[in-house]
């Protein structure tokens, strides 16, 4: 349903990507020009402009700043700044950000995704950042927040080959035959232009291996749920603590805590807090469920020309008519020169 809602945006965004790649004419437009003796040449001003924008925005690595709320927090602020720089460094953040800026300028929407790599540092795990192809991300169409904070959910689609899914999810090898193979289409939309620049985009590569490699679609759905927490106030010493459900169950089984509760010296208040739940499925098979200890979606959209919806416009969409005019003028000039020769 969410894919159908953004079908028109897919067409416009793919058209903008084609303009960046130098494919400005559809097959019908190219044939019509040749029928009247005009060439379908392209005087490409879009590519250079986008590359210049990317160069300006990503010429230097970002610098982080953390400020303590009080003077005693200065050391902790330095620790957080160092951690953020470390995460950026191990994630190859410059490359990830450059690709997100590229999607921002061409398709109109870039995405950065924060995740935990459980295999990093010999199993200790690391927090990392990567970019996401905007065509793989499906946002609730009802969202009206620039960063999709009010969305009921975000879906991340990943199409994997058999070898890839076994490598990423070793537990599915035993049930691989139960998973539905996926041959319908790529998340990446097909082009409506003539591929004059011989560009190999995901939709064309997908067709080249169609029916030769088994593929599976993984859907990771991020939703907001309410999770209970417990605020424990000790009237005896004035201390207060916040416990999740697991820690709370252990707390109420503690003999000393039970004595304090019986004496009325412990005040317990249950509060609901928003958290992000991740559910990953492959067809009808549940791969995993996880509740993230945050109320912010780990997928962060970077919209270009904001339209009040999850479907922004790109810089290219604003200059396509000017580029078409330039191409047409050159075609007419060349045709006139040939006729006058």
Residue spans of the language-model regions?
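Extended alpha-helical, oligomerization-prone segments that build pores/tubes and scaffolds
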Residues: 1-341
